[in-house]
A protein has these predicted regions:
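Feature recognizes metal-dependent phosphohydrolase scaffolds
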Residues: 1-163
Length: 163
């Protein structure tokens, strides 16, 4: 639900409107495409990049091995680890510390959580980027370079300034 609307229902209805009799075929192609996307990446310097991370309440049943194994249909279900990683919010410093140990990550860069100024810091090692509005930012990285959180914040570029 977002703004009182079931987005899944709207999405499915749009497939029927735009693709008619081919809706199921196109939906299957979308599903295959989305399932082919990587869940995360990690740089040699320990920067973990993902859409989101599991929230505090999801961590006890979360399988951190999903980034290193073949995913199953169960992983994508509402109680599955992919779902928890993609839709997670409200990570505490303890959750970030636990995930950092799982994945040998020093810093997390994620999105998924609205940030009025285009970015926000969560704890000492998570940077949240939001490019969905006119204060959005991007973050150029040198993948083998070691960064502090302050370095990352200093490197942010406002999207409004990109030509």
């Amino acid at each position: 639900m977002k703004d009182g609307y079931d987005l899944t229902e709207r999405f499915n209805r749009a497939f029927q409107v735009y693709y008619g009799g081919r809706a199921a075929e196109v939906a299957a192609a979308y599903r295959e495409f989305v399932h082919s996307m990587p869940l995360a990446g990690i740089t040699i310097s320990g920067i973990f990049l993902s859409h989101s991370l599991p929230g505090d309440s999801d961590l006890p049943s979360f399988d951190a091995g999903i980034v290193r194994r073949t995913l199953t249909d169960a992983d994508y279900q509402r109680n599955g680890s992919v779902y928890k990683m993609v839709w997670g919010r409200s990570q505490s410093e303890q959750t970030l510390a636990t995930l950092s140990k799982f994945w040998w990550a020093d810093v997390f860069i994620c999105g998924h959580q609205a940030q009025e100024s285009g970015y926000g810091r969560l704890g000492k090692n998570m940077l949240i980027l939001d490019s969905s509005h006119n204060h959005g930012v991007l973050l150029p990285l040198v993948l083998e370079k070691q960064y502090t959180m302050d370095d990352l914040v200093q490197a942010l570029v406002p999207l409004a300034g990109v030509e």
